[in-house]
């Protein structure tokens, strides 16, 4: 068996949570391979809205194994709050959620460091979520991290050493803070975490594959936030691309099957950083309002713009995408015309590739007729208006990959599969 991978292709917030929930009935295992509680996967069904930050989206399917991989960074306090909310809704986590011993822990001082580093940068700040993600990955790379498996061996000693090191840094930054409440909640989270099964996730996943089990790997954020291939330095601290599933779960490259790339029918971005197709007019405000574009974790209003096919083609290339999934088509239902960026202008020269630095590039647009039809109640591609089919054909021609799934609303039922005869 091979693993299938679901990735965001833009700057995150593409709607991965809903799609994973739609796809999970086809899989035995759902595994999260990177990121932390800085990104939220929003799912909406049966009239209730859920936001998952660290827990894989397969948790809503009663018979699935869910794995938090070694590439994930975990905040015990936030994990406890998230898990208890799910348990209160009737979902049994203890038996079905396994956590890699090699996953790194976000310490209370990591969150303080995150705030201190951002404050020190002033106007040059990245716009982090303040969840301690960057400092945790920094400790991981510098071989100073504390891992889930450390809870079982010499934990107090390792925690104290990390805390002392962080406090020394904070002293140098002259940053005032109070750790007491954060620490209190964190240690309660540690005790709660001990109720879960800690595993060597690389052995577990490869063993499940050997037994013929199907596995879906779930990424957080999006390709354009990848630490290497995103719009650096306005990126996250982990590899969000397809290869991140290999390092974040212990899966060999030849074990990868389908790669689902998910994107919105337009573009959004949260926080600072270049955004070539960003709209600053009433059209941008309209997309934001219709799309309810507010961060599920931060509560921040998202920046909105037209779809960027240059960035999307780049993401498809580095991820090896085999199937595309388009979200939030319904947000554009009322637009008379729709624009798509097909090239950039750099110093007056037109280019069709994603350059080293996208700061200051100008988008080159083509205009397409809108479909001006309410698609939210449609259940089959046979109901798609002619203009929407033309839009899909244009995207497939530009991107070279089929759009297999189209979302026409927030509910899991508002999901239409195409090419079902294949």
Walk through the language-model features, giving the residues of each.
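Non-transmembrane, aqueous-exposed alpha-helical and coiled segments at domain scale
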Residues: 1-422
């Amino acid at each position: 068996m091979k693993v299938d991978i679901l990735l965001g292709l833009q700057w995150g917030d593409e709607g991965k949570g809903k799609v994973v929930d739609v796809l999970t009935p086809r899989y035995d295992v759902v595994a999260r391979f990177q990121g932390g509680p800085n990104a939220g996967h929003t799912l909406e069904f049966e009239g209730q809205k859920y936001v998952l930050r660290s827990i894989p989206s397969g948790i809503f399917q009663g018979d699935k194994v869910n794995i938090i991989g070694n590439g994930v960074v975990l905040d015990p306090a936030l994990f406890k709050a998230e898990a208890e909310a799910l348990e209160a809704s009737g979902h049994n986590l203890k038996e079905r959620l396994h956590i890699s011993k090699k996953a790194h822990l976000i310490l209370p001082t990591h969150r303080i460091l995150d705030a201190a580093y951002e404050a020190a940068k002033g106007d040059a700040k990245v716009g982090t979520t303040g969840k301690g993600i960057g400092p945790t990955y920094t400790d991981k790379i510098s071989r100073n991290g504390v891992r889930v498996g450390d809870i079982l061996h010499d934990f107090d000693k390792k925690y104290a050493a990390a805390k002392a090191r962080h406090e020394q840094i904070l002293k140098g930054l002259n940053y005032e803070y109070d750790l007491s409440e954060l620490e209190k909640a964190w240690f309660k989270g540690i005790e709660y975490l001990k109720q879960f099964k800690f595993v060597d996730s690389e052995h577990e996943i490869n063993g499940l594959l050997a037994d013929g089990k199907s596995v879906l790997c779930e990424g957080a954020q999006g390709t354009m936030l990848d630490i290497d291939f995103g719009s650096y330095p306005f990126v996250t601290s982990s590899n969000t691309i397809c290869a991140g599933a290999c390092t974040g779960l212990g899966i060999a490259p030849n074990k990868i099957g389908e790669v689902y790339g998910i994107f919105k029918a337009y573009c959004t971005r949260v926080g600072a950083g270049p955004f070539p197709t960003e709209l600053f007019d009433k059209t941008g405000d309209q997309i934001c309002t219709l799309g309810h574009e507010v961060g599920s974790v931060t509560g921040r209003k998202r920046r909105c713009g037209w779809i960027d096919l240059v960035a999307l083609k780049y993401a498809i290339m580095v991820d090896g995408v085999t199937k595309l999934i388009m979200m939030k088509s319904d947000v554009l239902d009322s637009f008379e015309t729709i624009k798509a960026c097909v090239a950039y202008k750099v110093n007056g020269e037109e280019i069709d590739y994603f350059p080293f630095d996208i700061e200051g590039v100008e988008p080159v647009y083509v205009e397409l007729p809108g479909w001006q039809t309410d698609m939210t109640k449609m259940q089959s591609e046979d109901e798609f208006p002619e203009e929407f089919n033309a839009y899909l054909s244009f995207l497939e021609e530009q991107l070279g990959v089929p759009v297999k799934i189209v979302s026409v609303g927030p509910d899991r039922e508002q999901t239409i599969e195409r090419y079902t005869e294949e």
